[in-house]
Swiss-Prot record:
Keyword Iron attached: yes
Record-given protein name: tRNA-2-methylthio-N(6)-dimethylallyladenosine synthase
Co-factor binding details: Binds 2 [4Fe-4S] clusters. One cluster is coordinated with 3 cysteines and an exchangeable S-adenosyl-L-methionine.
Record localization: Cytoplasm
Species assigned in the record: Brucella canis (strain ATCC 23365 / NCTC 10854 / RM-666)
Ranges where the TRAM domain occurs: 405-467
Record's catalysed reaction(s): N(6)-dimethylallyladenosine(37) in tRNA + (sulfur carrier)-SH + AH2 + 2 S-adenosyl-L-methionine = 2-methylsulfanyl-N(6)-dimethylallyladenosine(37) in tRNA + (sulfur carrier)-H + 5'-deoxyadenosine + L-methionine + A + S-adenosyl-L-homocysteine + 2 H(+)
Residues reported to bind [4Fe-4S] cluster 2: C184, C188, C191
Cofactor(s) the record lists: [4Fe-4S] cluster
EC number: 2.8.4.3
Assembly and binders: Monomer.
């Protein structure tokens, strides 16, 4: 799952008849797809309380920043944003008006009270496992409290969240995220997720199917299942047997209206036979897999506590491509992990050449407080990290462009997601996740049409519709 602090304002319902006491909320999302999903579920909770969305903080009564803690810059972005909001809140106060500021997500979980100390203008801090308590927390804020809501028991937050209204789901489009698993038990030495999201927890089949059916009923055609280690999902199936993600995908594929399935993010250790069989047999499962490896060096993989070797990863890729030859691979890489030598880095470059990625995310290592990696010695100099990252990204970019060029002349089905920038233009999604731009003024959002790729754009494909 990419954690490159993509910033998204999630769609929320707009009321059709404004009320005098309507409260407006602005939600900003930093980070991964799961944060986007969490923002949408918080939006559902707030909609049930009478909040309506605004696309700017300028006229909001409540501003929520849903944060990411994977990398240091994400925290820096949060405090920079809070500094700007402080000025806005002070200006409101001078006019006798109020602005409530809330911090949600993984930085909220990791820093808790520290956020209130560093940014006293914040009214509410709420973690990713406690946002089902958001309406109650806001009521306490209106009563004059400063609220930090990060302690959670073994309880199912999804049982406490209202189902999204059909009209709200429609506004979000024909592709949707659905969280099926949260937390992580792998404890990679560079990663904060086990400390901010907790242990691995799988949602029940009943919950997942019910939410997927609601989404399909609202016009969703493509579902992306989310989890920190999504392929670690397991649970009792409808037949009484223990299911893994493969069996769950087969069940979701039976839901009328769901034409496409994806999942992210996976761990190599949890790619089992049933999941590989799903890639072989399930036509709705798209041929695109995000499977992070982080390094091509066995020595660094061991230091990272990744629990697999580079050759095991490569053999797994071979197994997957044997059953799905058109599979496109995406990955994550960290350069400059403590102790990484020139040879370790060259091993990573060789693995990248061996796999030939369609897309990948790469970052310089930055120590995260509280992780074992932060206590390691032999840190790599920043200049060396920079040079290695440039070399790696150049190779990955070349592979990505080559993958896009390989699409030219191919025929494929494309799911139309939205109108394009130009009149009569539509933007869809290829099976390999790339946006596809088509001159088409007859088909509608949600249609799946057959096209031929004629050229490439910037991270996109240009297509002609086929009869």
């Amino acid at each position: 799952m990419s954690d490159d602090t993509t910033q998204i304002e999630p769609a929320m319902a707009q009321e059709t008849s404004p009320r005098a006491n309507t409260r407006k909320v602005f939600v900003k999302t930093y980070g991964c797809q799961m944060n986007v999903y969490d923002s949408q579920r918080m939006a559902d909770s707030l909609a049930a309380e009478g909040y309506v969305a605004t696309d700017t903080p300028d006229d909001a009564d409540l501003v929520l920043l849903n944060t990411c803690h994977i990398r240091e810059k994400a925290s820096e972005k949060l405090y920079s944003a809070l500094g700007r909001l402080r000025k806005m809140k002070d200006a409101r106060a001078a006019d006798g008006k109020e602005l409530t500021i809330g911090v949600a997500g993984c930085v909220a979980q990791a820093e808790g009270q520290e956020i209130l100390r560093r940014a006293p203008n914040v009214d509410l801090v709420i973690g990713p496992q406690t946002y089902h308590r958001l309406p109650n927390a806001l009521a306490r804020v209106r009563g004059g409290e400063k609220v930090v809501e990060t302690d959670y028991a073994i309880e199912d937050k999804f049982e406490h969240l209202p189902a999204p209204r059909r009209e709200e789901t429609r506004k979000r489009g024909v592709s949707a995220f659905l969280t099926v698993q949260e937390g992580c038990d792998k404890f990679c030495t560079f990663c904060v997720v086990p400390y901010t999201r907790g242990s691995e927890v799988s949602r029940s089949v009943k919950q997942i199917v019910a939410e997927a059916e609601r989404l399909a009923d609202s016009g969703v055609r493509e579902l992306t299942l989310l989890g920190q280690n999504v392929n670690a999902w397991h649970g009792e199936g409808e037949d009484g047997r223990e299911w893994g993600l493969g069996e769950l995908l087969f069940r979701l594929a039976r839901i009328p209206g769901i034409a496409r399935l994806r999942y992210t993010t996976s761990h190599p250790r949890d790619m089992d036979d049933s999941l590989i069989a799903a890639h072989r047999d399930l036509r709705q499962l798209m041929p695109y897999l995000h499977l992070p490896v982080q390094s091509g060096s066995d020595r660094i993989l061991k230091a990272m506590n990744r629990r697999h070797k580079a050759d095991e990863y490569l053999r797994l890729i071979e197994r997957i491509r044997n059953v799905r030859p058109d599979m496109a691979l995406s990955g994550d890489f960290i350069v400059g992990f403590p102790g990484e030598t020139d040879q370790d880095f060259e091993d990573t470059m060789q693995l990248v050449r061996d796999v030939n990625y369609a897309q990948a995310y790469s970052f310089k290592y930055s120590p995260r407080p509280g992780t074992p990696g932060a206590d390691l010695d032999d840190h790599v100099e920043e200049a060396v990290k920079d040079e290695r990252l440039q070399r790696l990204q150049a190779l990955l970019s070349a592979q990505q462009y080559a993958f896009q060029d390989s699409m030219i002349g191919r025929k494929m089905d494309v799911l139309l997601e939205k109108p394009g920038r130009e009149a009569g233009q539509m933007v869809g999604r290829s099976p390999w996740l790339l946006p596809v731009i088509i001159d088409d003024n007859k088909d509608r959002v949600g249609d799946i049409i057959h096209v031929k790729i004629v050229s490439t754009g910037t991270n996109s494909l240009i297509a002609q519709k086929l009869a």
